[in-house]
Curated annotation (Swiss-Prot):
It is an enzyme of class 3 (hydrolase). Its EC number is 3.1.-.-. PROSITE patterns: HD (PS51831), KH_TYPE_1 (PS50084). GO terms for biological process: mRNA catabolic process. This is Ribonuclease Y. InterPro entries: HD/PDEase_dom, HD_domain, HDIG_dom, KH_dom, KH_dom_type_1, KH_dom_type_1_sf, Ribonuclease_Y, RNase_Y_N. It comes from Exiguobacterium sibiricum (strain DSM 17290 / CCUG 55495 / CIP 109462 / JCM 13490 / 255-15). Endoribonuclease that initiates mRNA decay.
Length: 520
């Protein structure tokens, strides 16, 4: 074959390759276009699914947000309803209080109107009496002039003297009636005020003892507390002034002493020593000093709590600390601080009923026994010491007078002083408030019967009602009815002179005469 033939074949091959490449490229492009269209369709479908999911998620979030918002709104509405309910309750309570006050004012107004009517009636009676006196005076004057031929001046003098005596007699009777009625009304009002104050206030009281108990982890600790040859227990007793009683009581040590502050210091120190485990004289001295400082701080806090409880302020810090010491002071088993708080509240309630200064009454009631906090350290009665403290720390004159007069040592110069004395008597005389040792109680009853039986004609005497009444049986052949009254008065006077007792004692003399005959 020639060259031309190869050239033709080569050209044909190139042409065929071009044609095949063209169609192959076209088919590949179509395949890519179809794949792109398929992918685009898938993307659109995925976008639609994603959009639908996003739409649902947004819808759920919107519903959740709406639900939360509705819950918050409902919660706020409930809170507002509760607040409105509380406000409505407070308004109803205030309305009831106002109604009670209105009723009280109405009753007082009725009493005033009744009293005014009574006064007007008595005034009218007095005017009538005055007219009658004038008529009688004129008649008497004319009669005297006619009968005795007296001058007008002499007749006037005689009639004026008689009229004066008659008027004074009538005025005395009227004055006695008015005083009696006023006394009855005052007694009734006082009983109402006292009963109202008592029923409005209820205080908690605890029985005070002279011992404290410290619990131990085991009985081996007792030996460590005693120490070698008893040096530890001697050191603790010397530093605190408290007796330690270590007996067969399991896992316990008893602290005995009549000073509650020292006993509290000893208790705290011993508890710290037991907890620390190191018990020797130097450590004991360190713990006692630390406990004494803690007790002093606790006393100050107790005083501040007492003033806060009563609602008064402005008391000198040193006086507040002295007030806190009353927590560790008792009188006939009654805690003096609790007693002072009770007196303060009672005095404040009674002052409110009488329209007096409630805050000043509470202040006077809280401080009325302040002298008992240091009466074992300073010479003088607790009243004298209290007056000195009130004067030293510049208390109100009414408070000082209430301190001085609450036992009748000084005359009360204000209504608040009288209220404090009444509140003090209420708190002390309330059943269960104060205790009395069995020995002194029995001795007082025996002495009461001895005084009663020291009079002639007494057959037997009996002290009853816990010593608040004594009944004396007398011999009827020795003591008659007249002498029985005199004997009751004499026994009463002798009891007042020779016996110390709380409250009052009723003396009853019983004389019985029996006539017995037997029918046969």
């Amino acid at each position: 074959m020639g060259t031309t033939t190869w050239i033709v074949i080569l050209l044909l091959a190139i042409l065929i390759a071009f044609i095949v490449g063209y169609f192959l490229r076209k088919s590949i492009a179509e395949a890519k276009i179809q794949g792109a269209e398929t992918e685009a369709t898938k993307i659109v479908e995925r976008a639609q699914v994603s959009a639908e999911a996003t739409k649902k998620e947004a819808l759920l979030e919107a519903k959740d947000e709406a639900f939360k918002l509705r819950n918050e709104v409902e919660k706020e509405l409930r809170e507002r309803r509760q607040e409105l309910t509380k406000q409505e309750g407070r308004l109803l309570q205030k309305e009831e209080t106002l109604d009670r006050r209105v009723d009280s004012i109405d009753r007082k107004e009725e009493q005033i109107n009744t009293r005014d009517a009574e006064i007007a009636k008595r005034k009218h009676q007095a005017e009538e009496l005055e007219r009658k006196v004038e008529d009688l005076y004129e008649q008497g004057r004319q009669e005297l002039v006619r009968v005795a031929n007296l001058s007008q001046d002499e007749a006037r003098a005689i009639i004026m003297d008689e009229t004066k005596q008659a008027a004074m007699h009538d005025a005395a009777i009227l004055q006695k009636e008015i005083e009696q009625k006023a006394k009855e009304e005052a007694d009734k009002k006082a009983r109402n005020i006292l009963s109202l104050a008592i029923q409005r206030f209820a205080a908690e009281h605890i029985a005070e003892t002279t011992v404290s108990v410290v619990n131990l982890p085991n009985d081996e600790m007792k030996g460590r507390i005693i120490g070698r040859e008893g040096r530890n227990i001697r050191t603790l007793e010397t530093l605190t002034g408290i007796d330690l009683i270590i007996d067969d009581t399991p896992e316990a040590v008893i602290l005995s002493g009549f000073d509650p502050i020292r006993r509290e210091v000893a208790k705290m120190a011993l508890e710290k020593l037991v907890q620390d485990g190191r018990i020797h004289p130097a450590r004991i001295e360190e713990m006692v000093d630390k406990s004494r400082r803690e007790v002093d701080e606790r006393i100050r806090e107790i005083g501040e709590e007492a003033t806060y409880d009563v609602g008064i302020h402005g008391i000198h810090p040193d006086l507040v600390k002295i007030l806190g010491r009353l927590k560790y002071r008792t009188s006939y088993g009654q805690n003096v601080l609790f007693h002072s708080l009770e007196v303060a509240h009672l005095a404040g309630m009674m002052a409110a009923e009488l329209g007096e200064d409630v805050t000043l009454a509470k202040r006077a009631g809280l401080l009325h026994d302040i002298g008992k906090a240091i009466d074992h350290e300073v010479e003088g009665s607790h009243v004298e010491i209290g007056v000195e403290l009130g004067t030293k720390y510049k208390e109100h004159p009414t408070v000082i007078n209430a301190i001085a007069s609450h036992h009748g040592d000084t005359e009360a110069t204000s209504v608040i002083s009288v209220l404090v004395a009444a509140a003090d008597a209420l708190s002390a005389a309330r059943p269960g408030a104060r205790q009395e040792t069995l020995e002194s109680y029995i001795r007082r009853l025996e002495r009461l019967e001895e005084i009663s039986e020291s009079f002639d004609g007494v057959e037997k005497s009996f002290a009853i009602q816990a010593g608040r009444e004594v009944r004396i049986i007398v011999r009827p052949d020795v003591v008659d009815d007249v002498l029985a009254h005199k004997m009751a008065s004499d026994i009463r006077k002798k009891i007042e002179e020779e016996l110390d007792y709380p409250g009052h004692i009723k003396v009853t003399v019983i004389r019985e005469t029996r006539a017995v005959e037997y029918a046969k």
